[in-house]
């Protein structure tokens, strides 16, 4: 099952699937159905909370358009975690998840749900998913809405990346001492596993707005820079009092309002109905007095701007 877990890939599901179908047919293979997994965590690590949500929504819409065009059923899998930054798949928030990602056939329940929320809540969540994911649904976006989401992805990403690049050394150092709950390759060493902050050229070339495209292209970083796995990254951010859900979100909302007014915000909330609940949850772990002990003054100003504007 192909796993798509970067924003440029999520925005290109249509071309990925159509090429796969056409080449499979040319090779004589019959395709009766397609399963594809949409990663929800790593797009957030790369581009921030809102871009990850909107990227998955565009991917779902494109996948179901492929189903319609080729007559081949598509059964998407949503790979998500329990914290809002990673998808907020919990018993308390499952209605928002299913409303935000209509048409998914499978939702992953990761180990954090079992260990942080307990067996009984995990069992109830599994039963709800078993019942409600059986409903066959489709999902579509108009070209206008899809283009709007693409612009929002660029807006929120530029603020998120510009801040994250300034704190990566601190976050990597903290993440390296986060106690692991399962065996994983380390971020560095002869056998390692790390996340590259993506080159933004693939995203930038999809953006029609010239100013936005240039702003994304200006966020250049040194080759070889590494970031921890998303689990360690989120743990590090929460540990120093700044849930990553806030990074870039407040400034992104403000620019969206400046450009599109109240209707622009209403459109965002319409398609991301859980955003208020996600930010409310993350806000319980916000501790700006603690953050100030770890991060430079410039970053603190950006974070405070995000918090105020949320």
Which functions belong to the PLM regions below?
Residues 1, 5-13, 305-306, 310:
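Active-site-facing alpha/beta catalytic cores
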Residues 1-5, 28-49, 70-86, 103-116:
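Core alpha/beta catalytic barrel or barrel-like domain that forms the active/cofactor pocket
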Residues 9-16, 45-50, 85-92, 117-120:
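A short acidic (Asp/Glu
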Residues 13-22, 50-66, 91-95, 126, ...:
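Well-ordered, non-membrane alpha-helical segments in soluble/globular domains
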Residues 20-31, 68, 97-102:
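Acidic (Asp/Glu)-rich catalytic clusters
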Residues 43-56, 61-69, 76, 133-145, ...:
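Surface-exposed, charged/polar loop-rich segments
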Residues 49-52, 87-94, 221-224, 259-265:
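Short glycine/threonine-rich loop-to-helix capping motif typified by GTGT followed
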Residues 105-106, 114-310:
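Acidic, glycine-enriched catalytic cores built around paired aspartates
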């Amino acid at each position: 099952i192909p796993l798509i877990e970067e924003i440029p890939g999520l925005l290109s599901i249509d071309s990925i699937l159509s090429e796969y179908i056409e080449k499979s047919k040319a090779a004589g293979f019959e395709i009766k159905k397609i399963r594809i997994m949409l990663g929800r965590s790593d797009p957030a690590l790369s581009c921030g909370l809102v871009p990850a949500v909107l990227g998955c929504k565009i991917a779902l819409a494109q996948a179901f358009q492929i189903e319609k065009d080729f007559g081949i059923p598509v059964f998407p899998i949503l790979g998500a975690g329990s914290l809002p930054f990673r998808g907020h798949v919990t018993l308390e928030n499952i209605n928002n998840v299913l409303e935000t990602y209509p048409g998914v056939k499978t939702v992953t329940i990761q180990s954090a749900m079992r260990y942080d929320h307990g067996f009984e809540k995990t069992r109830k969540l599994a039963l709800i998913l078993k019942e409600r994911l059986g409903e066959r649904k489709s999902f579509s976006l108009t070209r206008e809405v899809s283009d709007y989401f693409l612009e929002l992805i660029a807006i929120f990403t530029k603020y998120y990346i510009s801040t994250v690049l300034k704190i990566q050394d601190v976050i990597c150092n903290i993440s390296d001492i986060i106690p692991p709950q399962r065996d994983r390759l380390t971020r560095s060493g002869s056998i390692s596993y790390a996340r590259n902050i993506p080159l933004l050229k693939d995203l930038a070339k999809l953006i029609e707005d010239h100013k936005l495209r240039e702003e994304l292209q200006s966020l250049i970083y040194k080759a070889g820079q590494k970031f921890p796995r998303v689990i360690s990254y989120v743990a590090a951010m929460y540990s120093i009092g700044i849930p990553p859900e806030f990074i870039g979100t407040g400034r992104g909302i403000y620019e969206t309002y400046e450009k599109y007014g109240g209707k622009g915000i209403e459109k965002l909330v319409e398609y991301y109905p859980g955003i208020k609940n996600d930010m409310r949850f993350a806000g319980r772990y916000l501790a700006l007095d603690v953050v100030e002990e770890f991060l430079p003054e410039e970053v603190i100003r950006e974070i405070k701007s995000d918090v105020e504007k949320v």
